Amino acid sequence: MSTPNSDSPAAQAAKKVFSRLDLDGHNLPPSPAPSSPHNGRRYALATELVYTETKDQYGASSIPIYQSATFKQSSSNGGSEYDYTRSGNPTRTHLERHLAKIMNANRCLSVSSGMGALDVITRLLKPGDEVITGDDLYGGTNRLLTYLKNNQGVIVHHVDTTNVESVRQIISPKTTMVLLETPTNPLIKICDIPTIARITHEANEKAVVVVDNTMLSPMLFNPLDVGADIVYESGTKYLSGHHDIMAGVIAVNDTELGDKLYFTINATGCGLSPNDSFLLMRGVKTLAIRMEKQQANAQRIAEFLESHGFKVRYPGLKSHPQYDLHWSMARGAGAVLSFETGDVALSERIVEAARLWGISVSFGCVNSLISMPCRMSHASIDAKTRAERQMPEDIIRLCVGIEDADDLIDDLSRALVQAGAVTLTVDGFHANTAEGAAAAAAGSEAAETTTTAAPSL
């Protein structure tokens, strides 16, 4: 059989045909094809979390893991969409487009941890820039800001960001960044983000309002919708939901701002790995059902503790001083709460007596965790500063998972009794605190009223 001349019409036709086929003889679009909607969200958020619009050339129902450091180019000039995974990877691109959709963002970027995300954001600052932030911050955030203050010439103002007037008094044309958390961790205080964003931009239109949305996730709150310029989250928490990866995400609407953040990620090499991008994408799909169960459990546990006389901090309780403000912005209360016992040693005994509640830092995973922030997650903040910021040394943080609520309450009850945190009565128990005594007295009065009224029924 003769071979057609390379210049013959038959040879040219063959080249055109086979240039479109892959090694298996398939003439299909490259993988991955662009994901996420082009015209905004089209379905309910719970649906969008699952619907990824993946168009793999082989019909894979899950996004492929492109575990490759380099990508071959079609010419000596390069120019292909991907060349080196530090700069970009198809798996990471799918994740980022999907996250942008659910975070109501124009662009989303993913990095190796939540603190990595904040590090990228703070590289927008230069010596002499002024930052306003809260007095109840995650310990890692406080550590990074302290470093920038002591070593990079950045001026950091810590104020009570739950008090808009306190923020207003500090804001000036020199303000470059306002960094907010809501709810705060672990005091569960609420910031009025729309108002703070407005007064910040009025003082300096170039200032950026940054919001750490880790405590709520995109399922419950979208800060970009209420005036924030940058939103970041620890993907390790609710987005992943299983504490088997570390990740951070950054969301913006401003294209120029997004380009600056991407430049830093590419330059420093902190982009999320392909495998972790795959795992985070998998976790995001179940965010709605996990958060629904975790919130329901957290609400029951918060009500249980409060009914027995403990001072509980949780925005799902109407006793929370900023209950109305929280619900004016958010779609849920989250699954992190804290309570006080009045005694550090007592709190330590409660934490160590728990069985189902794992003693650990972090939150947002399917299993429930218990900790003393002043001993663990916020230990990097010195005792003097904690006292100045009115952070109780005895405070216990509960990060509620998806277990059976009755089991969690039973285990917590046993820990409270074993630790000596409650006084047993014929009607149950109440906390050995002023609040607990008041609750017990109210219960006794109610019982007496019921007894007196009984004969007339």
From Swiss-Prot:
One Pfam family recorded for the sequence: Cys_Met_Meta_PP
GO MF term set: carbon-sulfur lyase activity; cysteine-S-conjugate beta-lyase activity; pyridoxal phosphate binding
Cofactor: pyridoxal 5'-phosphate
One term under GO cellular component: nucleus
One BP annotation, GO: 'de novo' L-methionine biosynthetic process
Disulfide bond sites: none
InterPro entries: Cys/Met-Metab_PyrdxlP-dep_enz (IPR000277), Cys_b_lyase_euk (IPR006238), Cys_met_metab_PP (IPR054542), PyrdxlP-dep_Trfase (IPR015424), PyrdxlP-dep_Trfase_major (IPR015421), PyrdxlP-dep_Trfase_small (IPR015422)
Keywords, sorted A to Z: Amino-acid biosynthesis, Cytoplasm, Lyase, Methionine biosynthesis, Nucleus, Pyridoxal phosphate
Pathway in which this enzyme or protein is active: Amino-acid biosynthesis; L-methionine biosynthesis via de novo pathway; L-homocysteine from L-cystathionine: step 1/1
Enzyme class: lyase
Residue span of region Disordered: 1-41
Locations listed in the record: Cytoplasm; Nucleus
E.C. code: 4.4.1.13
Catalytic activity as recorded in UniProt: L,L-cystathionine + H2O = L-homocysteine + pyruvate + NH4(+); an S-substituted L-cysteine + H2O = a thiol + pyruvate + NH4(+)
Function: Involved in de novo synthesis of methionine.
Similarity field: Belongs to the trans-sulfuration enzymes family.
Protein known as: Cystathionine beta-lyase
Organism: Neurospora crassa (strain ATCC 24698 / 74-OR23-1A / CBS 708.71 / DSM 1257 / FGSC 987)
